[in-house]
Swiss-Prot record:
The lineage of its organism: Bacteria, Bacillati, Bacillota, Bacilli, Lactobacillales. This is Probable dual-specificity RNA methyltransferase RlmN. Coiled coil: none annotated. It catalyses: adenosine(2503) in 23S rRNA + 2 reduced [2Fe-2S]-[ferredoxin] + 2 S-adenosyl-L-methionine = 2-methyladenosine(2503) in 23S rRNA + 5'-deoxyadenosine + L-methionine + 2 oxidized [2Fe-2S]-[ferredoxin] + S-adenosyl-L-homocysteine; adenosine(37) in tRNA + 2 reduced [2Fe-2S]-[ferredoxin] + 2 S-adenosyl-L-methionine = 2-methyladenosine(37) in tRNA + 5'-deoxyadenosine + L-methionine + 2 oxidized [2Fe-2S]-[ferredoxin] + S-adenosyl-L-homocysteine. Disulfide bonds join C127-C363. The keyword Metal-binding applies. It is found in: Cytoplasm. Its cofactor is [4Fe-4S] cluster. GO terms for biological process: rRNA base methylation; tRNA methylation. Gene3D superfamilies: 1.10.150.530, Aldolase class I. Specifically methylates position 2 of adenine 2503 in 23S rRNA and position 2 of adenine 37 in tRNAs. Pfam families: Radical_SAM, RlmN_N. It comes from Streptococcus thermophilus (strain ATCC BAA-491 / LMD-9). Residues 371-389 have a biased composition (Basic and acidic residues).
């Protein structure tokens, strides 16, 4: 993602740490079940109280401690003194004709993040954000228009799932979030510990119980973290944002490739496959006359040949971003020709189905557009006050 930033000068000042903000309390969603039990015991309660609280949070999905009717007022006071439940505020909801829902949430420090709900044939899938902004350096992506401001806490990541589920709970239609993809704004493995805690929380059988095989984490290619992740024992799916079949091209569109070129990346991927015996999915965004030539498809087939039985390639239509107008979407004919080369080489691949094309579809676009409007409004208000003096 590029170095372009749309922040105004006042926003560039050093930000106050979240935990130093007056009145800040972390979300209780940030605790694992074992940590919640330990905390309850340390505060004079029996272990079963923590189990009751966990059930209120993840099975009954309450939004305040006061709704926990079998918890004493004294213990509720302790909870309120130390935690909040959901730290996010809903700013904008956009619903597409195809059922895709895009949410803009405000964090306790006023920063904005996006979350997307996609209706699939197999259920409801939520795409969560893990960082405010991104420093990875993909030149085609809306997420990196704002540099990374901070990591999200584990509680803030879990809270996205909980608010999306609340959206459907309030509608009363009984629909449940069944799948999660960690593919929103930010690089998940650059916020490794919080993402791992999030995964273990939503996968917990006593809580949301989202199956590991229904969870996918996407990385742009932090090779050392891929190896580390292989040893964590979490059986979730791994996706790698590849987007180019050779180092020269990949380095030109993804800055991370300069640190972890394809040789290092594929060494880590092979280690992951050998360690977990799990398939890896490669994401390949189709950029018109950039990475969509038939020879690029042949290079991609050759690159993945060694791990063909345990790999899969998603060809992704590009969602244009106004700030990156030097890129455009590959034509259907070019995508079809690229796909045909892969299939002739025996590659498992698919052209990804698009979602939410009639709303701010590209990752980071809703947030970026909202920030622009907020700044324009602030400038207009400041100008009006100045003229009124």
């Amino acid at each position: 993602m590029s170095e372009v930033t749309t922040q105004s000068k006042p926003e560039r000042r050093k930000r106050q740490k979240l935990e130093d903000m007056e009145g800040y309390k972390p979300s209780i969603y940030g605790l694992t079940r074992d940590e919640l039990i330990d905390w309850a015991v340390e505060h004079g309660e029996k272990k079963f109280r923590a189990t009751q609280i966990w059930d209120w949070l993840y099975k009954k999905r309450v939004q305040s401690f006061e709704e926990m009717t079998n918890i004493s007022k004294d213990f509720i006071a302790k909870l309120n003194d130390n935690f909040c439940v959901n730290p996010l505020k809903q700013r904008i909801v956009q619903e597409s004709k195809d059922g895709t829902v895009k949410y803009l949430f405000e964090l306790p420090d006023g920063m904005l993040i996006e979350t997307v709900l996609m209706r699939q044939h197999y259920g409801l899938s939520v795409c969560v954000t893990t960082q405010v902004g991104c420093n990875i350096g993909c030149t085609f992506c809306a997420s990196g228009l704002i540099k990374k401001q901070r990591d999200l806490t584990a509680g803030e990541i879990v809270a996205q799932i909980m608010l999306v589920q609340k959206y459907f709970d309030d509608r009363g239609d009984g629909e449940r979030v069944s799948h999660v993809v960690v593919m929103g704004i930010g690089e998940p493995f650059d916020n490794y510990d919080n993402v791992l805690r999030f995964l273990r929380t939503i996968n917990n059988d006593n809580g949301l119980a989202i199956g590991a095989r229904h969870i996918t984490v996407s990385t742009s290619g932090l090779a050392p973290k891929i190896k580390e992740f292989a040893n964590e024992g979490v059986q979730v799916n791994l996706a790698v944002s590849l987007h180019a079949p050779n180092n020269d091209l990949r380095s030109s569109i993804m800055r991370i490739n300069r640190s972890f070129p394809l040789e290092k990346l594929f060494e880590a991927i092979e280690y992951y496959i050998q360690t977990t015996n799990r398939r890896v999915t490669f994401e390949y965004i189709m950029l018109n006359e950039v990475n969509d030539h038939p020879e690029n498809a042949q290079e991609l087939a050759d690159l993945t040949k060694k791990i063909r039985k345990l790999s899969y390639i998603n060809l992704i239509p590009y969602n244009p971003v106004s700030e990156h107008d030097h890129y455009s979407r590959s034509t259907k004919e070019r995508v079809a020709a690229f796909y045909d080369v892969l299939k002739k080489n025996g590659v498992n691949c698919v052209v990804r189905q698009e979602h939410g094309t009639d709303i701010d579809a590209a990752c980071g676009q809703l947030r970026s557009n909202t920030m622009k409007r907020d700044r324009q409004k602030a400038v207009a208000e400041a100008s009006g006050k100045s003229e009124g003096k």
